[in-house]
Amino acid sequence: MWVPLLNAFNQPVYLSIADALARDIASGLLSPGERLPTLRELAQALQVTPGTINRAYAEAQRRGLLQGEVGRGTYVRSTPAEPVPTPMAAPAAAPTQTAGQVLDLSIIKPSGDTAATWLRGALVELANGTDFAQALDYAPDGGHPQHREAGAQWLRHSLPEANGQQVVITAGAQHGLMVAISALTESNDLILCESLCYPGIISLAHSLQRRLRGVEMDEEGIIPESLRELCQRERPAMLVCVATCQNPTTATMSHRRREEIAAIAEAFDFLILDDDIYGFLASDPIVRPLASYAPERSVYLTSLSKSVLPALRIGYLYSPPRLLSRLTAMVRSSVWMPSPLTAQLASNIVNEGLDQQLVRLQREEAARRQALARELLPGLRIKAQPHSYHLWLELPEPWSADEFTTLARAQGVKVLSGSQFQAERNGETRGVRVVLMSPTREEELRFALTQLASLAGASDPRRFY
């Protein structure tokens, strides 16, 4: 039975196994068509989990070294494989577009291809783990202690002081927003947010019967003077804020700006809901989350959906102790409990360090796509961060955002009009949000951005009708 000699200790074990496979195939130690050990056999020989071996085999298949056949096992590939694409595959030919096909650049999500191979092994490990039976049962309020501790481990990359006792598990970040707003404010309370904000906040405020006001913004997000003036006129109960890579504008608050916002919250006695869903994309990791500037009046929210995979519907609320019981009660009354099975999968990903490896890959992929956008959108006013998944395109006159969005779709590209992000419909916006991470292939993204550049550069929109 083949057992690899592992030389590298500065990388994940599964990568060392994949490297050993490549080395032994190249040297002739492993022959074309040779059958490899089963997951369990090699896991026992190396004293690792079957999930680790599954990830190693999947990585080797991605490199074109192996092939698998259902019921027969895994074999050394008999014929050379096609070159393995990068997460965003480079174009082999000029872009083509099928009639009626629309490229969707409207949904913010991570690169699915980057995570899929890695997560197959995590799913195998979940099924074989000692906590599998517990993950099939009901969970206590707030979540199982080990799941809350894994949440705290994820949070410590931004909040070093995080502990599992102050973590509440939710069914994703959107559920976390609903839980926090429902539990900590009352009907007809005033909720503040950015003047251009995540549409999910707008729909929540409407369905929960909260009043919503948008605060004026600049390049760093909410303007302190505008926030203070609004607080002098009305009494807000909560500020919902995205301080890093804000959706849709990508605005990111400086250290000084966060201090000012926290001081205003203290002065006017309102809560802060710090939605840090994109915090892992920060270009300056030294800047702390907004919640850490006013920890006793802040609830911090994040999830793994944007860094790992949208289907991983697990979010984490981090709260001061005095608010925990209200948050856990609202989780119970809304969904009874987030899925313990999904929470266990998320915990395994965090505990094995897979989350940080995926964060690194997603950041690298986002940076590549931002560079491509700068190349293909010359002369246009765009707002973006070096690692943000999206950009904000400010349209020249005489465009309106709604008109541009309609015509872009007719040209085969779907983006979102700035009107969908307006907390209050009190004027026209000329901005549109363009998501760069959705297309799988570089030629698709190139086509979409080229179409948008051509459209935005037109002096007379009427010629597209």
Region roles according to the model:
Residues Q134-F268, F280-V299, G457-F464:
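Conserved core of the PLP fold type I
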Residues R363-R374, I382-L395, F404:
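Conserved glycine-rich beta-strand-loop-beta hairpin in the small C-terminal domain of fold type I
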